[in-house]
A protein has these predicted regions:
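A short, polar/charged loop-to-alpha-helix boundary motif
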Residues: 67-84
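ATP/NTP-dependent adenylation/nucleotidyl-transfer catalytic domains that generate, transfer
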Residues: 30-31, 56, 83-121, 126-377
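Short gly/pro/ser/thr-enriched loop/turn and capping motifs at secondary-structure boundaries
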Residues: 10-12, 41-43, 68-70, 152, ...
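CN hydrolase (nitrilase-like) catalytic-core segments centered on the catalytic cysteine
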Residues: 1-68
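Hydrophobic residues at beta-strand termini and immediately following loops
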Residues: 36, 64, 74, 174, ...
């Protein structure tokens, strides 16, 4: 019998890969195996435990739980574990959610933060981040901050308040409008930049995000709590985020979670208990930085965007191979261009839980400065 002492980090569907490798070893050697695995979060990595044993026939005889420390006695006969009744495995979506919770819990706790702060916008990303934070740390350790502007819809305020009530979280509200107006006055008077010019659109949108980031960091400095950022992998991939704005914080909970997976996780969490108002999930996503704005003004629909990102980043497909999958050439070209153009933003993003085999981290190696062009035309 072989005892394996492992520190194998979680990835989506990683356990199936562990089973396969173990059975291949047993088939080659005829040796039964007890595979023990580390549990806990370490920076971007989450170790899921899920220790198990297999007999010489490659049958699973013992299976410990995921994301929890556990001790189990194993009866051994003839140098192999005696088979026991196994609990039903978790759904993959449940494992993903637990990985995110454990990552937040251990990063916050092990680094000595007394709690966490986040900006609650009334949108789906901040809603999921808040749910994860509360499940990880407890409602008494979390403060949510709503920072509306003239572009914030009234239903965003209502939904944010409802969610805070459902989770029992303290919700602070601070309008950024006075600060935003004063910034624009100073910029116009000191730098002669008219705030209503077309060229100023990006400036005024990013300015709102940076005011919010500054307020959150001020609260963090006052309380000692860590700021959790709420951007998802889809946005970070194509740069649909603001440096020193919504990217400002200490830990990026959804850094490796695509937008389509965000929706699936919201639905999963609400199946346990209703904590995210349905309207948050059903509304068209919007940064609410200008009138009547939606994400799809700037990006392809998320189901298309995420599929292209997964093909290019996750599966290492060429642009031509992605187009051959019946994706629009213009969409493919735009997404790949944005991925490489925004490398500089990703380099400055905070760490976050890694759940996939390619998270723009250790397995992604592209320079910021390069004249290389993906497209020849």
């Amino acid at each position: 019998m072989l005892l394996v002492l492992s520190a194998s980090p979680y990835r989506i569907n990683k356990q199936a890969s562990r089973y396969q490798i173990t059975r291949q070893f047993i088939e080659q050697t005829g040796i039964s195996i007890i595979h023990t695995n580390l549990v806990g979060g370490q920076d971007e990595l989450v170790f899921d435990g899920a220790s198990f044993a297999m007999n010489r026939q490659g049958e699973l005889t013992h299976q410990l739980g995921e994301f929890v420390e556990a001790i189990e006695l194993i009866d051994i006969h003839n140098n192999q574990p005696i088979k026991t009744e196994l609990a039903a495995p978790q759904l993959p979506i449940a494992s993903i959610y637990q990985a995110l919770c454990l990552g937040v819990k251990d990063y916050t706790r092990k680094n000595g933060f007394p709690g966490a702060l986040l900006g609650l916008s009334g949108g789906v990303d901040s809603a999921l981040t808040l749910a994860i934070a509360v499940d990880a740390l407890g409602a008494d350790k979390i403060k949510a901050v709503m920072m509306p502007s003239q572009y914030t819809a009234s239903i965003s305020l209502k939904d944010a308040n409802e969610m805070a009530e459902l989770l029992g979280v303290e919700l602070l509200e601070c309008s950024i409008q006075p600060l935003f107006d004063q910034f624009l006055l100073n910029i116009e008077s000191d730098f002669q930049i008219p705030s209503d010019s077309t060229a100023s659109n990006t400036m005024t949108e990013n300015l709102q995000a940076r005011i919010r980031g500054t307020l959150l960091m001020a609260l963090s400095n006052h309380s000692g709590s860590i700021v959790l950022t709420t951007g998802n992998k889809s946005e970070i991939a194509v740069g649909y985020c603001t440096l020193y704005g919504d990217m400002a914080g200490g830990f990026a909970v959804l850094k490796d979670v695509s937008k389509t997976l965000v929706y699936a996780l919201c639905e999963y969490r609400n199946q346990i208990s209703r904590v995210i108002p349905e309207r948050i999930i059903q509304r068209a996503p919007s940064a609410e930085l200008r009138p009547n704005q939606t994400d799809q003004d700037s990006l392809p629909p998320y189901e298309i965007l995420d599929a292209i990102i997964e093909a290019y980043v996750g599966n290492n497909y060429s642009p031509e191979e992605i187009i051959a999958l019946n994706y629009n050439e213009a969409d493919v070209q735009k997404v790949i261009h944005l991925i490489h153009r925004n490398e500089y933003k990703r380099r400055q993003s905070p760490p976050g839980v890694r759940i996939t085999h390619c998270d723009f981290g250790t397995t992604w190696h592209y320079p910021i400065t390069s004249s290389y062009k993906i497209w020849s035309t």
